[in-house]
């Protein structure tokens, strides 16, 4: 076969390929120019709650740093599973992120038969903030300390209220009962407001609830605060001891707010987003904004966040197995 026709065909193929090349942007080109459109942060809780209050100024700061809108979208329901599932199914392109309390990612997979997604489809990237629960009791009981409550369980049946099965208040109370070897009867409610109402009314004895929910009632004397669950004292109630300071030094009922993403977000996109978020997290302005909801901004590397998530998952799995906790 003559060589000249072969050469002509090869040159024609090369020319065609060169014409097509500009129309086929590479993955590297797409990540280099990120973000090209608005970014979503999914919050699997209702608006105006502590986690929602914490993320909105962060989103505004990241929006300013990256030059694209950063939109907070609330997707409440099923103890956070609905919002988490939306993130798990999203494209791993850096345009969808998750901001969630740690039980959404560290507890739900152990207590729900089906959370609606594969738990390894979401990757934790920043342990952004921590918060605690406050142990309160009806003042008519006369308890002045955690020890008073624990001692009372040995002579009478006590009840405790929570915002629902698997909620932070439920987990931390069962953790305390496990630590002390005593029992109380769990009365779950559909949210903290009705739990607080019945506790004040004397229909239930005690409970663990978030500080912003309980502070006005503590100040009015309608409930008595005994301790806070975390290792650090509450910024809202610094006079209140921790449970660790109340005779149980190993106890730690700290909860976390995690920033996470669908598995597979390119490393350079992760880096840009996380750097902008970390600057916002560590700003004094952000610390001041979240103090009224008793959240402490911390921030972390991705490795440390994943280590923390793994540690908490193991801790809560052991507890939920022990108390045979299952959610519908």
Task: State where each predicted segment sits.
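An extracytoplasmic/periplasmic, membrane-proximal ligand-sensing/linker region
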Residues: 36-38, 267-328
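N-terminal secretory signal peptides that target proteins for export/translocation
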Residues: 1-6
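Beta->alpha turn/N-cap motifs
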Residues: 99-104, 108, 192, 209-214, ...
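Bacterial N-terminal signal peptides
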Residues: 12-23
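C-terminal lobe and pocket-closing loops
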Residues: 118, 130, 214-283, 311-314, ...
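N-terminal (or domain-start) structured segment
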Residues: 29-121, 157-159, 165, 181-205, ...
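Hinge/capping helix and adjacent helix->loop/strand transition within the periplasmic-binding protein
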Residues: 89-95, 110-194, 243, 256-289
């Amino acid at each position: 076969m003559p060589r000249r026709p072969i050469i002509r065909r090869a040159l024609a193929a090369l020319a065609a390929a060169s014409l097509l090349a500009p129309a086929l942007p590479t993955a590297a080109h797409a990540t280099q120019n990120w973000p090209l459109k608005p970014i979503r942060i999914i919050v699997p809780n209702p608006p105006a709650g502590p986690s929602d209050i914490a993320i909105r100024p962060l989103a505004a700061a990241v929006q300013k740093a990256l030059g694209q809108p950063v939109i907070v979208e609330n997707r409440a329901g099923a103890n956070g599973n609905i919002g988490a599932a939306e993130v798990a199914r999203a494209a791993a392109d850096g345009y969808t992120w998750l901001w969630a309390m740690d039980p959404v990612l560290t507890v739900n997979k152990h207590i729900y038969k089906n959370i609606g997604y594969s738990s390894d489809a979401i990757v934790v990237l920043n342990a952004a903030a921590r918060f605690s629960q406050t142990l309160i009791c009806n003042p008519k009981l006369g308890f002045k300390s955690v020890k008073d409550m624990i001692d009372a369980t040995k002579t009478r049946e006590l009840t405790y209220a929570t915002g629902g099965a698997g909620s932070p208040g439920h987990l931390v109370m069962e953790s305390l009962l496990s630590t002390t070897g005593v029992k109380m009867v769990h009365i779950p409610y559909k949210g903290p407001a009705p739990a607080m109402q019945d506790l004040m009314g004397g229909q239930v004895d005690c409970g663990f609830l978030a500080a912003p929910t309980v502070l006005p009632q503590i100040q009015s004397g309608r409930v008595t605060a005994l301790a806070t669950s975390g290792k650090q004292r509450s910024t809202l109630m610094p006079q209140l001891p921790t449970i660790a300071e109340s005779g149980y030094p190993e106890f730690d009922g700290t909860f976390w707010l995690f920033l996470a993403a669908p598995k597979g977000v390119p490393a350079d996109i992760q880096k840009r987003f996380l750097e902008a978020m970390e600057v916002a997290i560590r700003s004094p302005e952000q610390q001041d904004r979240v103090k009224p909801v008793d959240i402490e901004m911390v921030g972390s590397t991705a490795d440390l966040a994943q280590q923390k998530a793994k540690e908490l998952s193991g801790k809560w799995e052991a507890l939920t197995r022990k108390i045979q906790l299952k959610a519908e």
